[in-house]
Regions:
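Glycan-recognition surfaces
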Residues: 1-53
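C-terminal beta-sandwich/jelly-roll accessory domains of carbohydrate-active enzymes
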Residues: 114-189
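A generic secondary-structure signal marking the coil-to-beta-strand transition
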Residues: 39, 104-106, 180-182
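Catalytic cores of secreted or luminal carbohydrate-active enzymes
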Residues: 35-86
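Flexible loop/turn segments at secondary-structure boundaries
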Residues: 24-28, 49-51, 57-59, 115-118, ...
Length: 189
């Protein structure tokens, strides 16, 4: 996350090599989810550096979904205006987003590094949207989170609270672990 964040100061998203690697990682042996690795890799050239033949059927389905997502949003991600939202060098999260030229569509990547119990509720202010537009926000391009104006999303922010803030969930992907991520798809109505 820090490497990609820092690289974004010198290179556009379309120039950054960003791939889903094997887990545990072969250099530092950290074990992160396929979802997190994909969510980070979207904001670069996107590819895979692992033996697909060693993945489970469930993991292969997830890879197919990641490829579908990237094909659907490639133009936006590669050519949109990039905004840095949370600096991983100064906090426990990294976040960035890309916004289309007409400001009708955006993809937000939010990445929490280490999980802590009883964290406060958090909001993250977005950037580059049309203040007067009405937007629908979906989590991971599936679950609708709500409808908000651009002004709400940029001034009050987007709820980034994880389930360590007192809520409990055993649903896969809904509970917060170390190196946890969430994508938000923001589209004008």
């Amino acid at each position: 996350l820090r490497i990609q964040y820092g690289t974004s100061y010198a290179y556009p998203v379309s120039f950054m090599g960003s791939h889903v690697s094997i887990a545990p990682n072969h250099q530092i042996f950290r074990n992160t989810s396929l979802k997190l690795r994909g969510d980070v890799a979207y904001f670069g050239t996107f590819g895979y550096e692992l033996d697909l033949g060693k993945l489970s059927a469930k993991e292969l389905d997830e890879v197919r979904e990641q490829i579908r997502f990237m094909k659907k949003y490639r133009k936006l991600i590669q050519q949109g205006t990039f905004y840095r939202l949370k600096d991983p060098f100064t906090g426990n999260a990294a976040a960035w987003m890309v916004v289309s030229d007409d400001r009708r569509q955006a993809i937000v990547g939010y990445y929490k590094m280490l999980a802590h119990p009883c964290t406060p509720y958090t909001w993250m202010k977005l950037a580059g949207l049309d203040e007067a537009a009405d937007y629908t926000v979906r989590i991971d391009d599936r679950e609708e989170m709500g409808q908000f104006t651009g002004a709400e999303l940029m001034r009050a922010g987007l709820d980034t609270t994880d389930f360590s803030a007192g809520e409990q969930s055993r649903e896969e992907g809904r509970h917060c672990t170390d190196f946890w991520s969430r994508l938000f798809v923001v589209e004008a109505k």
